[in-house]
Amino acid sequence: MEPSSQPQPAIGVVAGGSQVYPAYRPAATVPTAPAVIPAGSQPAPSFPANPDQLSAQHQLVYQQAQQFHQQLQQQQQRQLQQFWAERLVDIEQTTDFKNHSLPLARIKKIMKADEDVRMISAEAPVIFAKACEIFILELTLRSWMHTEENKRRTLQKNDIAAAITRTDMYDFLVDIVPRDDLKEEGVGLPRAGLPPLGVPADSYPYGYYVPQQQVPGAGIAYGGQQGHPGYLWQDPQEQQEEPPAEQQSD
């Protein structure tokens, strides 16, 4: 029987003392695999910064999630482009300015709520009525996109909350959306794309909270398909005013 070629564990002496401590003992090895010894005492990162370091399964999950997310974005972008093209054609072909979807008297009353407004022309409420109609239609379309992503057939108020948090021009509506609706079903998915692997949590867009249980690079399943990771909206004011954990325990 040949002697083992593995080095025997060394005995180290700590400077300034007489007590002897055994050095790190290598893990048991098999003939076909080398021993794995930690390179240093510093803790390894929670996830690799280089995608090449991921396992084949994680790479496949990330690629599927990224592909699904890109296809979903392209489909939704086409829907929005078609929506605005139809609205422009509708505006250009409008000849009836007497019948409107929204009551002009109610719109005029809202406009007069501003004390600085003294006189309102006859065509101003007409423009506001059309603008409000388009606003409702677009917000409904964006909300319905979130409904379909979650494999549902009924538009709910948390879908509207998702549409608001996803769209920059709807930021002025964030404060009127209940926080319970923002937290439901991963509301607030960013539209810029999937975050790159290895990016720390503090580099995500301001105002988005990454759930701790969500593994970076892993996708959320939507009806058997791999989807994009979810993000939850966190109120910036609450982020600043939230006391440290030590103070809360007191």
UniProtKB/Swiss-Prot annotation:
Q: What subcellular compartments does it reside in?
A: Nucleus; Cytoplasm
Keywords for this protein: Cytoplasm, DNA-binding, Flowering, Nucleus, Transcription, Transcription regulation
Q: Does the keyword Membrane apply?
A: no
Principal place where this protein is found?
Answer: nucleus
Q: Where is the composition biased (Acidic residues)?
A: 238-250
What would be one Pfam family of this protein?
Answer: Histone
What family name appears in the similarity comment?
A: Belongs to the NFYC/HAP5 subunit family.
What is the protein name given in its UniProt record? Answer: Nuclear transcription factor Y subunit C-4
Origin species: Oryza sativa subsp. japonica (Rice)
